[in-house]
């Protein structure tokens, strides 16, 4: 049986709507709320020629922006106090909202869509956060 997919996007992206993905499996996330998160995503896009890695934004509530990073890549480093790390570990479980690429996914959408298997570069994200 052929288990490879012909999908042009990662298998963790749902076909429709949105789903919660457990942190630490395919990725972790760094959440930055409000306009700060949007400005950070746009700044990373400029630094990476338009491809910062997958970034999800939320349209309501805190208007959170989720930067999808490699699993466990945020550990053992200081982060700014206004940042939330969504990771897993002993006694810790977190879930990350992931929208489909098309269709009705409100209140979630892709600020930057996933391309291939690349995620947001954790050190670049961290450096950009401290440079604000």
Regions found by a protein language model. Name each.
Residues 79-85:
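"Short basic amphipathic alpha-helical interaction patches in structured regions
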Residues 1-61, 70-75, 87-132:
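Signature for HUH/AEP ssDNA processing cores
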């Amino acid at each position: 049986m052929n288990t490879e997919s012909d999908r042009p996007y990662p298998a963790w992206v749902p076909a429709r709507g949105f789903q919660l993905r457990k942190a630490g499996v395919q990725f972790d996330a760094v959440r930055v709320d409000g306009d700060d998160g949007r400005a950070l995503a746009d700044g990373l896009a400029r630094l990476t020629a338009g491809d910062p890695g997958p970034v999800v934004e939320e349209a309501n509530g805190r208007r959170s922006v989720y930067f999808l990073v490699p699993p466990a890549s945020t550990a053992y480093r200081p982060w700014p106090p206004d940042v939330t790390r969504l990771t897993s570990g002993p006694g810790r479980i977190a879930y990350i909202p992931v929208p489909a690429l098309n269709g009705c996914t409100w209140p979630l959408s892709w600020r930057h869509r996933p391309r291939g298997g690349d995620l947001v570069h954790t050190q670049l994200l961290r450096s950009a956060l401290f440079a604000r």
